[in-house]
Amino acid sequence: MDEYKSKLPRIPISKCKKIARTDPEYILTSQAAFAATAFTTELFIQMLAEETCSLAQIHKQTKTLRLNYEDLSTAIRNLDKFQFLSDVVPQTENLASLVRENKVRYTIVNPSPEIDIESEDEVDEANEPEVGEPEVDEAEVEAEVEAEAAEPETHTLDEPRPESSS
């Protein structure tokens, strides 16, 4: 029995079939092809993990090693054979630096006391609408929400009535 189990891939063949069927160019494929795909996927994951582990051991000073997303994205960025994965596993960036570079807009609605805001000018600049962006009148939004709440709910016979929480 153990000898038979060692001949099977660790990745379920049914998962390979499911993933293959999501491809719009899917054609009928034999069971052997799915098994080969499962084995090659297993070998690829093993190789990626080993390469990531060896790079992480070089860069980290601790004896115990736990791989994380940062290690994986660094290995993909540094090793040529994994460059094709750079879009799927991008390098993480600090949110504060992205806000400073105006790559991301970040608005604090209710700042909590734990958040350290560098200066009020930066927050005011971040909250100003960009050129061409329509300004939102809060009174109009509140009026629309109240109007929607005042409308009676209608249901067809096919739809179940939502459970009331009262």
Curated annotation (Swiss-Prot):
One of its GO terms (cellular component) is CHRAC. Pfam families: CBFD_NFYB_HMF. One of its GO terms (biological process) is DNA-templated DNA replication. Residues 115-151 have a biased composition (Acidic residues). GO terms for molecular function: protein heterodimerization activity. It comes from the Eukaryota. The keyword Transport does not apply. Gene3D superfamilies: Histone, subunit A (1.10.20.10). It is found in: Nucleus. Keywords: DNA replication, Nucleus. SUPFAM superfamilies: Histone-fold (SSF47113). Residues 152-166 have a biased composition (Basic and acidic residues). Residues 112-166 are annotated as: Disordered. InterPro entries: CBFA_NFYB_domain (IPR003958), Histone-fold (IPR009072), Transcr_DNA_Rep_Reg (IPR050568). Heterotetramer. Consists of four subunits: POL2, DPB2, DPB3 and DPB4. In eukaryotes there are five DNA polymerases: alpha, beta, gamma, delta, and epsilon which are responsible for different reactions of DNA synthesis. As accessory component of the DNA polymerase epsilon (DNA polymerase II) participates in chromosomal DNA replication. This is DNA polymerase epsilon subunit C. It comes from Kluyveromyces lactis (strain ATCC 8585 / CBS 2359 / DSM 70799 / NBRC 1267 / NRRL Y-1140 / WM37) (Yeast). The lineage of its organism: Eukaryota, Fungi, Dikarya, Ascomycota, Saccharomycotina.
